[in-house]
Amino acid sequence: MGLLDAGITKHNVVVTSVDNVLNWARLSSLWPMGFGLACCAIEMMATNASNYDLERFGIFPRSSPRQSDLMIVAGTVTMKMAERVVRLYEQMPEPRYVLSMGSCSNCGGPYWEHGYHVLKGVDRVIPVDVYVPGCPPRPESLIGGLMKVQELIRMEQIGLSRADALKKLAEKSIDPQSVIEQHRQVARA
């Protein structure tokens, strides 16, 4: 799975670029801050439980935006809550990523037409990198979204903009269920 799993045979030297080292360190140690606002937060909590165990992916939840590099917005964002979402986003250090989880944070959900108090997508107030659809999305979907964030980090380069990395990411597809099964098989062995 990792760089050293295959073993280093002769000279014990690994040659790589600065981009690869920085991206490997960032994607192997994501620190998300969950911003749970509705029923999607329950699925986010289930993802952190022992059945799915996000820590095996190097993902350690944080409660402070100053320690986080990923914000997971899960649930219905109201107009009053939008100001707090922006404030928390601004408190996060660079590079920072946002994952929008669920129909409500993606586009307003079932409240989009008649809910005057509901923001019609969190992307209207902060930039979103990855969208996870569903009402509420299953933990496997959230893990798939987190893997998309890791792929986005892997594709970033010093001279490449975030928009270009997002275009590259849109061309790739990841099956989260196969990755979960792969990790379970490794854990059993």
From Swiss-Prot:
Database matches in SUPFAM superfamilies: HydA/Nqo6-like (SSF56770)
InterPro entries, A to Z: NADH_UbQ_OxRdtase-like_20kDa, NADH_UQ_OxRdtase_20Kd_su
Residues involved in [4Fe-4S] cluster binding: C39, C40, C104, C135
Gene Ontology molecular functions: 4 iron, 4 sulfur cluster binding; iron ion binding; NADH dehydrogenase (ubiquinone) activity; NADH:ubiquinone reductase (non-electrogenic) activity; quinone binding
Keyword Hydrolase part of the UniProt annotation: no
Membrane topology category: Peripheral membrane protein
Subcellular locations according to the entry: Cell inner membrane
Annotated GO biological process: aerobic respiration; electron transport coupled proton transport
First-listed, main subcellular location of the protein, grouped into a coarse class: membrane
Keywords assigned by UniProt, alphabetized: 4Fe-4S, Cell inner membrane, Cell membrane, Iron, Iron-sulfur, Membrane, Metal-binding, NAD, Quinone, Translocase, Transport
Gene Ontology, cellular component aspect: plasma membrane; respiratory chain complex I
Top EC group: translocase
EC code: 7.1.1.-
Cofactor section: [4Fe-4S] cluster
Cofactor note: Binds 1 [4Fe-4S] cluster.
Enzymatic reactions: a quinone + NADH + 5 H(+)(in) = a quinol + NAD(+) + 4 H(+)(out)
Family: Belongs to the complex I 20 kDa subunit family.
NCBIfam families registered for this protein in UniProt: nuoB_fam (TIGR01957), PRK06411.1 (NF005012), PRK14813.1 (NF011388)
PANTHER family recorded: NADH DEHYDROGENASE, NADH-QUINONE OXIDOREDUCTASE SUBUNIT B 2
Assembly and oligomerization: NDH-1 is composed of 14 different subunits. Subunits NuoB, C, D, E, F, and G constitute the peripheral sector of the complex.
Function description: NDH-1 shuttles electrons from NADH, via FMN and iron-sulfur (Fe-S) centers, to quinones in the respiratory chain. The immediate electron acceptor for the enzyme in this species is believed to be a menaquinone. Couples the redox reaction to proton translocation (for every two electrons transferred, four hydrogen ions are translocated across the cytoplasmic membrane), and thus conserves the redox energy in a proton gradient.
Name of the protein in its database record: NADH-quinone oxidoreductase subunit B
Organism, scientific name: Chlorobium limicola (strain DSM 245 / NBRC 103803 / 6330)
